[in-house]
Amino acid sequence: MLEIGNLSKQFGGLSALSDVSFGIRKGEILSLIGPNGAGKTTCLNLITGFYTPSAGRVRYGDADITGRAPYAIAQVGLIRTFQKTNVLKGLTVFGNVLTARHRHGDTSVLRAFFPGKAQRQREERLRDEAAAIVEQVGLAARMNVEADSLSCGELRLLEVAIALSAGPRLLMLDEPAAGLNTQEAQQLGGVLKRLMGTSVEAMLLVEHNMALVMEVSDRIVVLNFGRKIAEGAPADVRNNSAVIEAYLGMPAT
């Protein structure tokens, strides 16, 4: 579905990512992990067009999307979240998701000021879709609650809902479990697994929460100092000596 080939990024004399290759298959959750500064978010920024690679290619299906603008990459179904929230705190949960659905719709200025029957029907459809998305992420009971009253875990779920509003084929999440307690992270994991195969075709998870990663991932890619040091199933990565050394700072015994 998505292929990363020999991807590299340099900032001046600093190599942030070096010759990294991996693929994401339809129907799987792939997690990208590594210590702080390993190059995870840099890799995500290269995939989604926020950085231009120094070398290497990014292919999505049959298309080479290397260096395309972020909006062009989003238009083909690659949607990402950011570490910094994009939630509108003054709106309700439903209002946030409905606003996001409108943002990715086809309403013109003329239609907005002179709504006809078709526009009213479209608005009703968007409202139904927004409500369905809120339910998908487990926030139906909080539908009419303002976002600034949500817990940290609920805010993260709302961020996922906003991303779903763009109609992603490949959903990419940048540290969605940051700041969550164990129960909230488990709830998030359950939502992500339910979304696979129903709302999205594949998922890329950049994450530090190892319990979440091991629970939801089909495969894991591990970066350290900008290089890929391991790739495989969760059980294999957990016992990989290079991964243990990268995280603990000492050779595995």
Q: Model features per residue range: what roles?
A:
Residues 1-253:
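Glycine-rich phosphate-binding loops of nucleotide-dependent enzymes
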